[in-house]
């Protein structure tokens, strides 16, 4: 029999995970905006790229580790470390983070260069950065520079199904890693405490075929557990 207390605890843990993802994005936003402004001041691309990569890695690891404060078990730190340093779909978190941060720097350099072509003042460039750092290549200033100054650049593409927006790639990578870390720690905590399996419950009425496919049956330990995607708010009741 599933109790109200079990449901309450499962929902609270999911909310803590979602809050960790939300808080991480706020911090990542500040890091990226600061980095873009540094590029406009002439700080080297390589230095900025390495700095933001390190900062975002620290932010992501910090929020992932917060999961252990809610679900403590003997091998928690070891399990989390292995996950954070592990290869998932061909790359580690840090591999992807480094790649996406380099893309962000390259995108911002294009936007800043367009501003220079238009002879924008430093204050105007700063304003453009504030308004466009989340999707710099769609900044109106680029189209203006192309039209008025014959400005050219090679628009990057990364393949079907992959975002071309570096900001989105960075934040998705960070938030998905945090979400997966919370899910792993939660699952392993109950496994260590003798759980035989779990039921999945929807935490939202939003239509989602992936989430819905896991509802209504008992899952044995070792089967997929929530979160099932980056914005998943499903929760599991372990028995």
Predicted region positions:
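N-terminal leader/targeting and assembly helices and adjacent pre-domain segments
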Residues: 1-162
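Acidic, glycine-rich two-metal-ion catalytic cores of nucleic acid-processing enzymes
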Residues: 154-239
